[in-house]
Amino acid sequence: MFETFVNFFKTKEVRNKIFFTLAMLVIFKIGTYIPAPGVNPAAFDNNQGSQGVTDLLNTFGGGALKNFSIFAMGIMPYITASIVMQLLQMDIVPKFTEWAKQGDVGRKKLNNVTRYFAIILAFIQSIGMAFQFNNYLKGALIIDPSPMSYLLIAIVLTTGTAFLLWLGEQITQYGVGNGISIIIFAGILSTLPSSLIQFYQQAFVGQSDTTMAWLQVAGLVIGLVLLTMGAVYVLQAVRKIPIQYAKKQSTQRLGSNATYLPLKVNSAGVIPVIFAMAFFLLPRTLTMFFPKADWAQQIANTANPSSNIGMVIYIILIIAFTYFYAFVQVNPEKMSDNLKKQGSYVPGIRPGEQTKKYITKVLYRLTFVGSIFLAVIAILPILATKFMNLPQSIQVGGTSLLIVIGVAIETMKSLEAQVNQKEYKGFGGR
């Protein structure tokens, strides 16, 4: 592992990309400490803040929400917009469906619409969030709660979201990995120290008997190790479907019989968990404008994964999004057509429609295992806070762990591929 990291920095091109990414993340972190104009960040000092979805937003944003900084909205509006856009492509909006079939050209059009939609959503959510937090903090957040103040805050927070999207694009183009994922990854890691401090204060400070606290620590460490091992296994595990080439039957002894079609146990990665949590923001956005209404409070309680009903909805959403995104990532029909064009086939399965049905069947089974695993990982920390008296920040621990591991794995693969490509070019003399 250490040798792998050394190789990353030996390659000039990869090294420059790493340093560029780190520079962009420093800018991101600095922005989380710059408060929005007209707010009093100290209002949060003596309050625990909201829980559930809000805690996750704060974690994804690197603590920007609790500071009510210019990046307080983070990139969640973009994620929510992406969910809506992908759903609209399913023959709901014909034009979007048409673009989705146009390859790179159509994808660029959809990305542009998604960005515009994200900006509109960020503006609406930022106004609602300012109302909600100012009401929650009994008017202590907004220094001058006039319409112009709310408008200014909304413009600044929306601009912050737009800047983060631009920052993510720069990382994707000139840095390492997927920019949006890297920003979320960095945000989660940056809030880890404060979560540990909160746990220490709740478990040890002012306690005469720390036996239970040490048992909690032991349980957390064991749970963390097991969850990490399980996450790595499921995110990396693949089902190898053997394939053969019709024109190479005589060359099996040369290794053609070892050819296979890899299908991940969890083809969707950690996206379903992020999507499920972002989905909770849609009804909560409306309730932000009516913080004192009983019906709004009921919706807010339901749209919270820490509540009993919210937990059930959370599980259903994770499973549903896992299936949805798995078939976005893996297209059995296209895969079957490609095998047929290459003159290859799955032993015992007829090419064409039968192969498509077989791949679909295997993908359904694999996705079921992957979706259950994601749901369990996301729910276990929530249950732990309910029954083990752990800090509320632990609730998002499972989700955060999955994202950190998933992004780390994909980033490592990307770096290794770039290093190998550079070495190959050097060997071939270009």
Curated annotation (Swiss-Prot):
InterPro entries: SecY, SecY/SEC61-alpha, SecY_CS, SecY_dom_sf. The chain crosses the membrane at residues 18-38, 68-88, 117-137, 148-168, 179-199, 215-235, 270-290, 308-328, 368-388, 390-410. GO terms for biological process: intracellular protein transmembrane transport; protein targeting; protein transport by the Sec complex. It is found in: Cell membrane. The keyword Membrane applies. One of its GO terms (cellular component) is plasma membrane. Keywords: Cell membrane, Membrane, Protein transport, Translocation, Transmembrane, Transmembrane helix, Transport. It is a multi-pass membrane protein. The keyword Transmembrane helix applies. It holds the Pfam family SecY. Belongs to the SecY/SEC61-alpha family. The central subunit of the protein translocation channel SecYEG. Consists of two halves formed by TMs 1-5 and 6-10. These two domains form a lateral gate at the front which open onto the bilayer between TMs 2 and 7, and are clamped together by SecE at the back. The channel is closed by both a pore ring composed of hydrophobic SecY resides and a short helix (helix 2A) on the extracellular side of the membrane which forms a plug. The plug probably moves laterally to allow the channel to open. The ring and the pore may move independently. Component of the Sec protein translocase complex. Heterotrimer consisting of SecY, SecE and SecG subunits. The heterotrimers can form oligomers, although 1 heterotrimer is thought to be able to translocate proteins. Interacts with the ribosome. Interacts with SecDF, and other proteins may be involved. Interacts with SecA. HAMAP family: SecY. This is Protein translocase subunit SecY. It comes from Staphylococcus carnosus (strain TM300).
